[in-house]
From Swiss-Prot:
EC number(s) per entry: 2.1.1.177
PANTHER family assigned to the protein according to its UniProt record, in alphabetical order: METHYLTRANSFERASE (PTHR33603), RIBOSOMAL RNA LARGE SUBUNIT METHYLTRANSFERASE H (PTHR33603:SF1)
Subunit structure as annotated in this protein's UniProt entry: Homodimer.
Main location: cytoplasm
Entry keyword Protein transport: no
Compartment annotation: Cytoplasm
Protein name listed in UniProt: Ribosomal RNA large subunit methyltransferase H
InterPro entries: Alpha/beta_knot_MTases, RlmH-like, tRNA_m1G_MTases_N
UniProt record similarity statement: Belongs to the RNA methyltransferase RlmH family.
Residue sites binding S-adenosyl-L-methionine per the record: G85, F104, G105, K106, M107, V108, W109
Pfam families: SPOUT_MTase (PF02590)
Catalytic activity: pseudouridine(1915) in 23S rRNA + S-adenosyl-L-methionine = N(3)-methylpseudouridine(1915) in 23S rRNA + S-adenosyl-L-homocysteine + H(+)
Coiled coil: none
Amino acid sequence: MIDDYLRRFDKTGRGLGLSLGQVVEVENRKGGGMAAEADLIRARLPGGVFWVMDERGDVMTSPGFADRLGAQRDRGAGDLTMVIGGADGIDPTLRDEAGMAISFGKMVWPHMLARVMLSEQLYRAASILAGGPYHRV
């Protein structure tokens, strides 16, 4: 399901100046909590702007997310990286460094479900920006 939405995003987004980079998973096998995981994430960030998915972030509509994604593209800020934290969430220092923190609501979601939801919202945002029929209200 994740791969399907990411393929759709890549196909729809390409003509809009949005492209799919890579999906990178960081495993904190040594423990050390959120701070150690944040260091591992920082080491894998390609540079540029990153947004985090965090329950303390901004709750927004799908069109609002599309607008933010389009504005990020229009600023010419380069690649945008999306970060989903581990089981303990996002380290506060990493969250503070992010360009934006986004929440899928007040509930906490399992990591893999958050990946599906984010993948779908990326495709939906590209469809909204393209004026496509996928997003209906």
